[in-house]
Amino acid sequence: MAGVLGMILAGGEGSRLRPLTESRSKPAVPFGGSYRLIDFALNNFVNADLMRIYVLTQFKSQSLFHHMKKGWNINGITDRFIDPIPAQMRTGKRWYEGTADAIYQNLRFMELSEPEQVCIFGSDHIYKMDIKQMLSFHKEKLAALTVSALRMPLAEASQFGVIEVDAEGRMVGFEEKPSAPKSIPGDPDFALVSMGNYIFEADVLFAELIEDADNENSSHDFGKDIIPKMFPRGDVFVYDFSQNRISGEKAEVYWRDVGTIDAYWQAHMDLLKTDAPFSLYNRKWPLHTYQPPLPPATFTDSDNGRVQIIDSLVCNGSYVRGSRIEKSVLGFRSNIASACDISESILLGDVKVGEGCVLRRVIVDKDVDIAPGTQIGVNLQEDKKIFHVSDDGIVVIPKGARVGY
C-alpha cells in the first residue's frame, strides 16, 4: 500500500525468556514448530498488503538475520522490501535507549521512503491483525496517532500502558505500567491496555522524535514519553483490537504476550486444543515463514510398542519410533527413539531423545541430545539442580545440551 511504511521493533533482549534467549534475540525464538516470533508481526503486514517494512534489530541478531534472509527476502520487487536494519548508532556509540529512540535513530531511512503514515509495531506477541482496518480507523478519525488496545484482566494490567477513552475513541488518559491500573467504566475487572502498536502521521512522528531526542529528561520511550505528551491535544485515538476481523477466522481475537517461559509454554498448549483459539490453518490468512527442504515426518512402530501421536504438532524431518507423544510440539528434525513418553512438551528442533525417556512439561531448545532412560519433569527438585525451572514448573533444557551422559 503506497504511502505507508512499517517499522517493526525487533531488538528485544528477552531476559525473562532465558535460557531460550541466551544465543538469540527474543523475536528469533522459535514458536509453533515452524515459526519464529517475528513471523507473526511480519505476516500481519504482508497479509494486509503493507510491503514496505524495516525491521529494527539489536541484541544477538544473527539468528534473526539468517531467518529473514531465507524466509522474507522480497527485494527486487519495485517499491516493496522487508529489510532488517542493525542498530546504526547514528547518535553516538550507544544502543537504543528506548522504543522512541530506536525509531529516531532510523529517521533517515523513514525520510527517504517519504511515507504519509508510519506503522510502528512490536514483534514478540502471538496474534493476527489486519492492519488495514486499523489504518482505516486512523484515517477516518483524522488522528495524529492511533494506538491499538485490548481488554486485559485488571490483575495483569500493570504490565502494560493503561488507557482511558471517551465515547468517540479519543484517548483521554494514559499511564505506563501503573501500580494501580484504572478499570474500564462499567467493567470493573478489566482495564484497557496498549498493545504497543502505533500508527502515526509521518510528519507528526518526525517532529515528535526530533523534539524528544533533544529532551535530556526523556527516557525516549513511546509509552513513557511520547504518548503522555501527545494525548492531551485531542488528536490521539484508540483502535479497539476486538473489532478486528480476519477472513476465515471463527474464534474471537487472540493476543498473547509470550515474554515469560510460562506464557510461552501456555501459548503452545493453546495451539493444541480441539478448538484452538489461535489457528495455524487459515488458508485465507497464510502464515509465511522459512521452511527448510525436509521430508515429511515419519512414524513407525517398534518392538517396544506402537507409536501414538495425540493432540500434537510434528514438523517435517522428524522421526518417531514406537513412542507416545501427547499434547506436544516437535520442531524440525526431532528424532524420538522407541518407548519414550513425551507429554505437554515443546521440542524446538534438531533434538535427539534416546530410548525409554520420559519428558513432562519440558521445553527443549535446539541441538539437544538426551541419553536413553532419562526422566525430565518427573522430579522437579532434582531438575532444579541442573536446569532452569519456571514458577509454574516448566523445565527448560538449553541449546546444545547433552543430558544424562
From Swiss-Prot:
Keyword tags: ATP-binding, Carbohydrate metabolism, Glycogen biosynthesis, Glycogen metabolism, Nucleotide-binding, Nucleotidyltransferase, Transferase
CDD domains per the UniProt record, alphabetical: ADP_Glucose_PP, LbH_G1P_AT_C
One example GO MF annotation: glucose-1-phosphate adenylyltransferase activity
Pathway: Glycan biosynthesis; glycogen biosynthesis
Biological-process GO terms, alphabetical: glycogen biosynthetic process
Binding partners and assembly: Homotetramer.
Name the UniProt record assigns to this protein: Glucose-1-phosphate adenylyltransferase 1
Organism field: Vibrio vulnificus (strain CMCP6)
